């Protein structure tokens, strides 16, 4: 059967904390051009450490050793395997009484630490997702048109135009803004969407409530300003198609706020906005890029909020008896029995 067309809104966190590293760093090894190695090459490289790569792809730090009394000293290079009292010396090549003599011929490596920021990980994951949607749309049995829109959220101020703008002040924080209206996910559309993703830079707060407001605007095809107090028709927003399944995907590194730390009011407002989306048939996914993200936890504020926004809890609300948003009155309701809609991603591999 033909795949249902999708209208997807990606709601992306571009707060300043998205510039932080995600997970553990990795090492990148680069082969050197030099092939002839002496004791002095290794012992004299104060600022450079060299590594030997064995047949199994393991890397070991190369060390310089000398043995014997002065005038009869033997020089060698090699590496240790094992640890503690069980270290074994693995000599490379031969020994020599001349510390400048060539002892071994072969390739050694240098290394550098590679870190991935949350923003880089999100960009990689989102671009991979866009490619996957395009592949699905172009499948032999799935000749269907999917569309994707991009919303960024950061500061508690809107830019009432489509684009990627920042405030004109010292901090240059991101506006919360519709970056791309619904774009058909074909070859040209993929280039437009991935280009827009790559252009995002982190700066600002974590106003996820503003981001969800704009997601609703995109789906409705009209702007909502000043927290929903009035509406403006705008023909530049195409709105969702009646025959399309509507999906919102929220990427964030945690702490909903208009400044710092976990803001109860922002979290409550976000849960209520998500409730309205879900009540109108929109499926909402959340992806948590923060330490201790755990979809099975509904006690911790972060995880409770992420679950409440997602379709894990379709009836979640955070409203007091006066109809006001209140985190103290957050009620998740009953969890769905099928499907998962909140995912934890604490390193780049999980995001992919």
Indicate residue ranges for each PLM-predicted region.
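P/S/T/G-enriched low-complexity
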Residues: 1-352
């Amino acid at each position: 059967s033909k795949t249902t067309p999708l209208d997807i809104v990606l709601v992306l966190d571009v707060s300043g904390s998205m510039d932080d590293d995600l997970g553990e760093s990795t090492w990148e090894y680069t082969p050197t051009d030099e092939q002839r190695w002496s004791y002095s090459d290794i012992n004299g490289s104060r600022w450079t450490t060299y590594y030997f790569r064995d047949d199994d792809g393991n890397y070991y730090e190369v060390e310089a050793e000398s043995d014997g009394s002065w005038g009869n000293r033997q020089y060698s290079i090699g590496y240790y395997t094992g640890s503690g009292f069980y270290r074994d010396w693995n000599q490379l090549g031969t020994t020599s009484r001349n510390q400048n003599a060539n002892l071994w011929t072969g390739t050694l490596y240098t290394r550098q630490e590679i870190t991935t920021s949350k923003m880089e990980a999100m960009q990689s994951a989102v671009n991979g997702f866009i490619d996957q949607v395009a592949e699905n749309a172009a499948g032999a049995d799935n000749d269907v048109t999917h569309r994707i829109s991009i919303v960024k959220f950061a500061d508690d101020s809107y830019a009432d135009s489509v684009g990627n703008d920042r405030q004109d002040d010292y901090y240059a924080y991101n506006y919360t803004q519709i970056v791309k209206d619904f774009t058909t996910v074909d070859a040209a559309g993929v280039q437009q969407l991935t280009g827009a993703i790559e252009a995002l830079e982190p700066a600002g707060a974590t106003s996820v409530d503003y981001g969800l407001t704009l997601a609703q605007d995109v789906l409705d095809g009209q702007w909502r300003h000043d927290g929903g107090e009035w509406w403006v028709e705008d023909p530049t927003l195409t709105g969702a198609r009646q025959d399309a399944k509507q999906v919102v995907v929220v990427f964030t590194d945690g702490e909903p706020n208009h400044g710092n730390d976990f803001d109860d009011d922002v979290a409550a407002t976000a849960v209520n906005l998500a409730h309205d989306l879900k009540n109108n048939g929109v499926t909402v996914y959340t992806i948590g890029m923060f330490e201790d993200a755990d979809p099975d936890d509904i006690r911790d504020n972060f995880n409770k909020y992420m679950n409440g926004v997602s379709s894990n809890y379709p009836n979640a609300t955070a409203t007091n008896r006066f109809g006001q948003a209140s985190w103290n009155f957050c009620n998740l309701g009953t969890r769905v029995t099928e499907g998962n809609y909140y995912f934890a991603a604490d390193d780049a591999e999980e995001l992919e």
